[in-house]
Amino acid sequence: MQTEGIQQKYLRKAGLLALITVTGMAPPLSTDMYLPSLPKMADYFGAATVVVNMTMVAFFISMAVGMLVLGPLSDRFGRKITLIVSLLLYMLASVMCAVTASIYFLILMRIVQGIGAGGMVSLSIAIIKDCFEGPTRATALAVVQSMSVIAPIAAPVIGALIIQVSTWRTVFFVLAAIAAACLAATFLFEESIHEDERNEGGIIDSIKRLGVVGRNVNFTSFLLAVSFFSAPFMAYLAVASYVYEDFFGLKPTTFSIFFAINALSSIFGPLIYMRINSRVPAKATMWVLFIIGFAAGISMLLFGHASPVIFLATMIPFSMANSYVRPFSTNILLDQIQGDTGSASALLNFTHTLLGSIGMFIGSLPWSSYVSGIGITIVGFLLLALAVWVYVLKSRWRYMINAR
């Protein structure tokens, strides 16, 4: 890969990709690592499941807000200082989460942590747009997405081991340490956006640049269509521990193995994308993704209650489709934006995160069983995605889609 613009004298290419990858891992690290602890946290705080799950829902909603604020600000003040602020917020909030004795203060600190994570995620995509272009950007996106699978594979396993030898509080201390390491690397990062490329005006003017990107209806329509895939996956994430531990009666360590297998399968999405991206038309790709998704959701509704193995087998195809969508759609969307990269990245990640948060809320509702809830969420959100996709095919963007 060849970087464009300012070279990274200290981080080099490998260090830059490592920093981008780890900061982009903020969502799975911040949720998956303490998934095995959720039942124990509910017992510790004496709180209902829906209240404890608010620690995740609040995180994702505030992360979406952080994206919308910090992403555009990076177009005005630069990537480096904005990333430093994001990491400081995340690190300090993680420490406060670790020492709190109140579930409501924990939710509050998760909000602060989410804002910092929002900046980390949106800036990781913006830096890729700054430093890579053409086929190398497609490869970089796929590499980062593939490497990010390490987080959901390792995080629940690490989390399960932590609660065996310590408590859930240690999980948040670990997150703070990861943020501290990224912060140290960020001080070595050389600014990737030149002074003459930055937006002018104040903070409000910078945030208003979101409207410039958002008013592109064709851009936002395609973004919405692919973002609907995030909702069912996040619904699964929110209740996976309850499905495996409460419904199927597995131990936390066994749950972490099942969870890791599903996460490991997700790595094949970006890998397949790297192999076939230049050979398979985007339009055909989308139709295949829809077929896989609907087949997975319907199979889960029909057979997913039978055993944890069958439930996992119905979830894996959707997880692979969801992991393919991200680099596939991100590369298409970034190609359409000239300037306002931070705003575009923020809007892109915000839409995925907002719909993911909605999916988490819907998945956490008191279904007759969470297995049915996940299956219904998959089918329902894919129907919405299909409706928007049909609109995209009838819009001016059909020429762009057909050309890919």
Predicted regions, residues:
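Juxtamembrane intracellular "pre-TM" segments in multi-pass secondary transporters
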Residues: 2-10, 192-222
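Helix-breaking motifs and short loop linkers at transmembrane-helix boundaries and internal kinks
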Residues: 44-46, 78, 99-105, 116, ...
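Conserved MFS/SLC helix-loop-helix module at the cytosolic interface between two early adjacent transmembrane helices
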Residues: 64-104
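Paired small-residue
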Residues: 89-96, 104-112, 309-317
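Cytoplasmic helix-loop-helix junction between adjacent transmembrane helices
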Residues: 103, 109-150
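Helix-loop-helix hairpin linking two adjacent transmembrane segments in secondary transporters
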Residues: 105, 134, 142-187
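C-terminal transmembrane helical hairpin of 12-TM major facilitator-type secondary transporters
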Residues: 283-329
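A late C-terminal transmembrane helix in Major Facilitator Superfamily
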Residues: 332-370, 378
